[in-house]
């Protein structure tokens, strides 16, 4: 199996099968690992360059199994022009490959809001079509 430049953490409990890859998503290919049940994205898509977002979505799609899920948190900044993404941007990139559902908005506590200038996080669940 090809390697990816990064670190792999694996759960040692035989009752649970969990792998956590810490690497660049753009280096990750289905030849490294595929058929994931789920991917947790906490800001990676939002932080990616606009020109790379479609490639990001394509890579995620390629490594998920048929009914795989993406759990995505998108930060809502106090100043809207500082990188807040709306559902249209997500939909334009994940398009027909996924069915998207907005689950909730998690409001930031006052300390987090002041320190990072963030109102909270929009949480999305996307199912692979």
Task: Give, region by region, the residue ranges found by the protein language model.
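Class I (Rossmann-like) S-adenosyl-L-methionine-dependent methyltransferase catalytic domain
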Residues: 1-18, 22-32, 57-59, 63-129
């Amino acid at each position: 199996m090809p390697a990816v430049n990064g670190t792999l953490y694996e759960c040692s409990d035989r009752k649970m099968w969990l792998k956590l890859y810490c690497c660049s998503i753009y280096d990750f290919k289905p030849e490294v690992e595929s058929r994931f049940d789920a991917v947790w994205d906490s800001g990676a898509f939002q932080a990616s360059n606009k020109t790379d977002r479609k490639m990001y979505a394509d890579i995620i799609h390629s490594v998920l199994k048929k009914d795989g899920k993406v759990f995505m948190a998108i930060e809502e900044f106090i100043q809207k022009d500082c990188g807040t993404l709306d559902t249209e941007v997500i939909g334009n990139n994940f398009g027909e490959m996924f069915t998207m559902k907005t689950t909730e908005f998690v409001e930031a506590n006052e300390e987090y809001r002041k320190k990072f200038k963030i109102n909270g996080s929009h949480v999305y669940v996307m199912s692979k079509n």
